[in-house]
Regions:
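C-terminal motif of bacterial Sec signal peptides marking the signal peptidase cleavage site
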Residues: 20-23
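Bacterial N-terminal signal peptides that target proteins for export
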Residues: 2-12
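Residue-level detector of conserved, function-critical positions
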Residues: 25-544
Length: 544
């Protein structure tokens, strides 16, 4: 097992979270075979090492205190006598013995190690990419340790950047560093503070420059919404300000326009990407522009309780006011919806307490799904999450109150159901754009299944986390336990991208974990009864 954020000899962890709309077209290519890997697996407080086919490289009957349960190419890291060691695939050669007692998970295949009170960077072959010279080192980006997008290092309370492979991007000049979500979604830019001044750093080019804002609020259509304190403005992809920082609110940039409000009680309108007013403020609410238009709620005399209509880039109304509510089209639990470029979710009230929802295509200016669903959202241009009024429900407790929440399914644009409602409360598109994640509950530590875009089940909902590794052709399944700040994760199964199992664990006998290969053949332990504790003699205990 691995424990998150620990720097000493203790388990360590990382995880992935799902993003949206990474792929718009279904990938029909045949998945690549599993890459060659060395995979430590820990069960029953013992650790064995497998290859990508589930064959055993190192038996579980060994002297290792723990192994780092991270798949590497041809090595693995284990602890013994309070020190971390790097070994070859079958453990017959110790490549880097006793190299540290302070290990950090950084980026894939790269690790921080401590020596004489200083940290350096090591690759998975044991090469010291950066010699120990740093007071501090950790992974950077909006991803957990071990899956970082870059590396942050500190010297004398100043911080600098290393690339994902450990090369120097900046000198240690900065007091703080901030990432906007996934840096890949923000052109590689990172915000930094240096001597009370605001800077941006481009991780890809190494460019640094001073800017007049201190926060990225949104990034879309190659433009940023940025802010300084409570005032917002628009910047281009190079972080050049296109407007003054004077707006109370700005929406998400889309198709050359961005919504704005100058003050809290102002009406909203739209700016173009030159910072000029394209549609004068005349609306109570303004949504993101698609290629054809955007949804707006006109100002009314009854306190803004009118309906939404669809307008063109000229401001001309293209539809009559129709919808009681509109919002982002990516479904998420608890109403925390996210933007889907080119789509808007629509809603119509059925009575004071019930609303039905649909999907409007703002690129084409057409209604894709009429408001007939109690929940709906976009996965891809041809796939939608949905729940109908008669869909099965599950009991969900939130803030101590129990209520019934509809279960979700997946259908295509023609209405064909690919995943029936009944089991899942949350369904999202995987970051790769090639897979669908389906969660049985709304919490982080819920069982997660993985499907392909045709609705084929690849990984059953037996474990709490499924990591997609396209480069290796692998799907890794992990069990999660503990609180978010003290979480452990244990590798429990490996599948190919088409859902063929390579190995998995199962519970047998007296709750003993047993590893089996893809054909169901036992790998280890072959004698699970030996891991059962001695039965207690209750009568003898009572007699004493």
């Amino acid at each position: 097992m691995e424990r998150m954020f620990s720097t000493r000899l203790a388990p360590l962890a990382f995880s992935l979270s799902a993003l949206f709309l990474a792929g718009c077209n279904e990938d029909t290519a045949q998945p690549a075979a599993l890459a060659s890997m060395v995979i430590p697996v820990c069960v029953n407080d013992e650790c064995l090492v497998l290859d990508q086919n589930g064959a055993m490289l190192v038996n579980g009957d060994n002297t290792y205190a723990v192994t780092l349960s991270i798949p590497l190419n041809n090595t693995f890291i284990f602890a013994e006598d309070g020190q971390w060691n790097l070994a070859n695939a079958n453990g017959s050669q110790i490549i880097k013995p006793n190299f540290t007692d302070g290990l950090r998970l950084l980026t894939p295949g790269y690790f921080g190690f401590e020596r004489d009170g200083k940290f350096g960077v090591m690759d998975q072959q044991g090469n010291e990419v950066q010699a120990p010279a740093y007071d501090e080192i950790y992974s950077g980006g909006d991803l957990p340790p071990g899956m970082g997008q870059y590396i942050v290092y500190g010297i004398d309370e100043k911080f600098g950047l290393l690339g994902a492979d450990g090369h120097v991007v900046t000198e240690p000049l900065f007091d703080s560093l901030t990432t906007y979500k996934d840096i890949a979604l923000a052109g590689g830019w990172i915000l930094a503070e240096r001597d009370a001044q605001n800077w941006v750093i481009n991780l890809q080019t190494g460019e640094t420059k001073q800017v007049g804002f201190d926060k990225f609020d949104e990034y879309a259509n190659d433009h940023f919404v940025v802010s300084l304190g409570s005032k917002k403005g628009l910047a281009d992809a190079s972080n050049k300000l296109l407007t003054d920082l004077k707006y109370y609110w700005m929406g998400i940039p889309g198709n050359g326009l961005v919504a704005f409000k100058e003050n809290h009680d102002s009406l909203c309108g739209y700016l173009d990407f030159q910072g000029k007013v394209a549609i004068a403020p005349a609306y109570a609410e303004c949504e993101v522009f698609g290629q054809k238009g955007a949804m707006v709620k006109p100002k009314t005399d009854d306190g803004g309780k009118g309906k939404f209509s669809f307008i063109a880039r000229t401001g001309q109304a293209l539809t009559e006011p129709t919808f009681d509510w509109v919002g982002p089209a990516v479904h998420a639990p608890m109403g925390m919806f996210k933007n889907a470029p080119g789509y808007t979710q629509t809603g119509t009230l059925q009575n004071m307490f019930v609303a039905y929802y649909g999907i409007f295509d703002t690129d084409k200016g057409i209604e894709l799904l009429k408001p007939e669903y109690v929940q709906v959202g976009v996965l891809t241009p041809d796939l939608f999450v949905f729940a109908k009024p008669d869909s099965p429900t599950k009991t969900v407790t939130f803030l101590g109150a129990a209520n019934q929440q509809p279960t979700l399914g997946v259908m295509n644009a023609s209405g064909k159901v690919l995943i029936e409602p009944g089991q899942y409360l949350n369904i999202t598109l995987d970051k790769s754009g090639r897979f669908i994640r389906a969660m049985t509950e709304s919490t982080r530590q819920t069982n997660t299944a993985l499907y392909d875009l045709k609705g084929k089940l690849l990984v059953p909902a037996q474990w709490q986390e499924v990591v997609v590794d396209e480069a290796r052709g692998a799907l890794f399944a992990y069990a999660l336990e503990g609180t978010p700040n003290d979480e452990t994760r244990s590798l429990r199964a490996l599948y190919s991208l088409n859902g063929t199992p390579s190995f998995q664990t199962r519970t047998v006998g007296c709750d003993v974990q047993q590893v089996i290969d893809g054909s169901g053949k036992v790998v280890w332990p072959t004698d699970p009864e030996n891991f059962c504790g001695e039965p207690e003699d209750d009568e003898a205990a009572d007699a004493q």
